[in-house]
Amino acid sequence: MAWWKAWIEQEGVTVKSSSHFNPDPDAETLYKAMKGIGTNEQAIIDVLTKRSNTQRQQIAKSFKAQFGKDLTETLKSELSGKFERLIVALMYPPYRYEAKELHDAMKSLGTKEGVIIEILASRTKNQLREIMKAYEEDYGSSLEEDIQADTSGYLERILVCLLQGSRDDVSSFVDPGLALQDAHDLYAAGEKIRGTDEMKFITILCTRSATHLLRVFEEYEKIANKSIEDSIKSETHGSLEEAMLTVVKCTQNLHSYFAERLYYAMKGAGTRDGTLIRNIVSRSEIDLNLIKCHFKKMYGKTLSSMIMEDTSGDYKNALLSLVGSDP
């Protein structure tokens, strides 16, 4: 499924609002789970992974009102490691969480370009607007200006272009003539010449609607006798290549893109826990069920089975609770 349709697929949700919800007993359960010596991690998992983000915010307010403590700070003091990172991620309102991930990606030692590319290429215009607003409120600076300060060259240009959200056009109308012209322009900017006109690629990939781009990719393959992905791989490299390929993947099928992100977060030695946590948390109330279906189709195993193989303890249990039953 193309990326712009993924946001309206209600059947994709794995974490739903709890029926007959009352934040006061939930807050009390969490308080008792962390009171005194030791912590009842399972009680924390049972409450926070089975409530929607809106409900978690209500629980946090009740916790503060009843016990005079900040719930997130209390969780941080009681938990540790990857489990703490996951549970704290659940407590952020969605746009503030993504703003935090972007801020951390730029302010850590060495910029994590992959995180920035993932978020900017896969969100809609309205979501990007909310993320930018949350970023400025929480960090006192402009997301666009921080990206410009932290990246350079063509990568900076494509990220700033993506931030404008110009691809978020759900119109089904496509001008065949313009699509064909764009395909010819891409061919002329890469395969046809020695060297590459990167700005032509950036302009077309980041300013055309998703429906239009799908037609462009079809026309391009007829002209070049190779896919747009193969041309990007041969014409660019590094983070710019990753950014362009991500735009193409998200345009073609957003669920497959996230399935791939989750798979490679766990494949091979070690686990990219940041990628695993971010994508499970951020997609759990949007389309994680659909991502799970694509994951199984693409890799011949379920997302939950791979989580069981690759993680352990309370961290594993919390992830599995968020992911839900197998497709």
Curated annotation (Swiss-Prot):
GO terms for cellular component: cytoplasm; sarcolemma; vesicle membrane. InterPro entries: Annexin, Annexin_repeat, Annexin_repeat_CS, Annexin_sf, ANX8. Keywords: Annexin, Blood coagulation, Calcium, Calcium/phospholipid-binding, Hemostasis, Metal-binding, Repeat. One of its GO terms (biological process) is endosomal transport. Signal peptide: none annotated. SMART domains: ANX. The keyword Metal-binding applies. It holds the Pfam family Annexin. Ca(2+) binds at residues 266, 268, 270, 310. One of its GO terms (molecular function) is calcium ion binding. Gene3D superfamilies: Annexin. Annexin repeats lie at residues 21-92, 93-164, 177-249, 253-324. The keyword Repeat applies. This protein is an anticoagulant protein that acts as an indirect inhibitor of the thromboplastin-specific complex, which is involved in the blood coagulation cascade. Belongs to the annexin family. A pair of annexin repeats may form one binding site for calcium and phospholipid. This is Annexin A8. It comes from Pan troglodytes. The gene is ANXA8.
